[in-house]
A protein has these predicted regions:
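Active-site region of glycoside hydrolase catalytic domains
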Residues: 1-261
Length: 261
């Protein structure tokens, strides 16, 4: 992934020139709880990508905590220079936070099975406090603020964009007496209000947040859950493909209109 990013950035700049605006989007984690566990996961889930892309090197600690499953001998001469291409903006996907703690399991040997956090077999994921979205993810607007501030503190040279943020709800389609259709989703509106406020606090504290994309415009196919989870601010009747704007759509429209100028 890191090499592909470097090759893509080189190719775009070679083809488009100075007009090119290059970026990368990462699913960054923000964890709460035990400091050692949070640091371990930050190395594996965040800095394994951010450091080579933005600093031109992998963290030394990353090598030590993954030595039981990987010797990193695949890194070839010139790879880091290729990965470390200048970008104009860093995209961040954010939905929720995790609560973690170090376990009493030994770090090594570690399983070589597929994992979202290789090198963290001695970290426990703990239950999070509610409320939760329909995905089971906790709602933590402060986590967005804290993540934006931390990324800016560590990598101050790059502008930031929130490329995904939103929630899945158990949306119900209502057919009104006059035949019109509506979807009332007050929880989603509250979610967006609170996350927008958290992002605004980060901006006020100096974070160069230049964009924000709500996930998502339409209900869509989720990789793991298919059509069972609805993130859109527009309801999709999958049988007819009809699109019905939800209450959150109207709220978001009015919010954007109020911000013009």
């Amino acid at each position: 992934l890191n090499l592909a990013h470097g090759l893509m950035t080189q190719a775009v700049r070679a083809d488009v020139g100075d007009k090119a605006k290059c970026s990368v989007t990462l699913n960054l984690q923000f964890n709460r709880g035990d400091a050692d566990a949070c640091h371990r996961l930050d190395l594996i889930s965040n800095r394994a990508f951010l450091d080579p892309m933005l600093r031109g090197r992998y963290p030394d600690e990353l090598f030590s905590i993954t030595k039981g499953i990987c010797d990193w001998d695949f890194i070839q001469s010139g790879d880091l220079e290729l990965i470390h291409q200048p970008i104009d903006v860093l995209g961040i996907n954010y939905y929720s936070t995790n609560r973690v703690a170090m376990s009493d399991r030994p770090q090594f040997p570690q399983s070589t099975e597929a994992s979202t956090a290789p090198g963290a077999s001695d970290v426990d994921w703990l239950p999070t406090e509610g409320p939760h979205t329909d995905m089971g993810w906790n709602i933590d607007p402060d986590g967005l603020h804290d993540l934006l501030v931390r990324v800016h503190d560590n990598y101050p040279e790059v502008d930031l964009v929130v490329t995904e943020n939103g929630m899945a709800c158990k949306d119900q389609l209502t057919v009104n007496e006059d035949g019109t259709k509506s979807v009332h989703d007050p929880d989603r509106i509250d979610y967006l209000k609170r996350h927008f406020a958290a992002a605004k606090r980060a901006i006020d504290e100096g974070v160069p947040l230049t964009g924000y994309f709500v996930w998502s415009l339409l209900d869509n196919f989720e990789w793991y859950f298919g059509y069972a989870k609805r993130f859109g601010i527009t309801y999709v009747d999958y049988a007819t493909q009809e699109r019905i704007p939800k209450d959150s759509f109207m709220w978001y429209r009015d919010f954007l209109a109020s911000r013009k100028g």
